[in-house]
């Protein structure tokens, strides 16, 4: 969608931003970063360089999801470093089967699926909790199974029973926390909090663990409210900010791209999100983030009737296009947690 080229120099301040503040997008630096996308036409995770606008031809790296109903509509992918399985891509798919979608860890070096599980909801986002080996999914709704509904909506944690092990492969062994419309999850390694976004809320959770350090649940410690469906949640790799998107059009006053920060107040012994400020007054943005050099990149849908685009937008230069592609989300490939 080319309307972003008309908006690159325009910033709409949020209701919580300082009155009269105005920002103009800075030109991108020349640093060459790698971008990972989920592409639903081929149903692949693909890697490209942000140094080129032509993304046609074979991707620099790609992985094709199996041709089964639970693997349809890849929805998220994030590159993470593990101690026992090297660099992996944690990924999820909405799925179309009555049993739901999928979550998985795919090893980068040989593209082997080292772990996977069916998630009865429609997984929109996935994360790995560093230091615990747990996989987290966010599902916007439950998925029908036969004549009943399984509790697949919300936040679901697949937690290894021992340190260094793989998570369970059965959803029955996962830990579930309700969150209507859950669309995004992110492990905040600086604050050691799990962040999640869904209908009308951005939440922060602390991990609840047993005496052996194994996760047994989540404790909600902070909430930021807004109107609409929170869609994506990403770090700002150029600052300590958290970036999130809220869906909708002009009928929703809180649509667009927002930033905030999570902080702990030792005086009150409480966690809180900073007052948010709106970066851009955009509609239907599916993902948005900033690279370490400040370059912004995003995927937006042409309208409310669809959810993909053949284009990934970048600040300071022309967009990157792959003819016939259906990009749903774009991520910074090179981010790893130690």
PLM features: what roles do these ranges have?
Residues 83-84, 130-131, 189-190, 237-239:
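Residue-level detector of Asp-centered blade-edge/turn motifs that repeat once per structural unit
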Residues 5-26:
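N-terminal export signals
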Residues 70-81, 121-128, 180-184, 227-235, ...:
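Repeated scaffold domains used in trafficking and secretory/extracellular systems
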Residues 64-69, 116-119, 175-179, 223-227:
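Surface loop/turn motifs at the tips and blade-to-blade linkers of beta-strand repeat domains
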Residues 96-100, 142-153, 253:
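Short, solvent-exposed loop/turn segments at conserved positions within beta-propeller repeat blades
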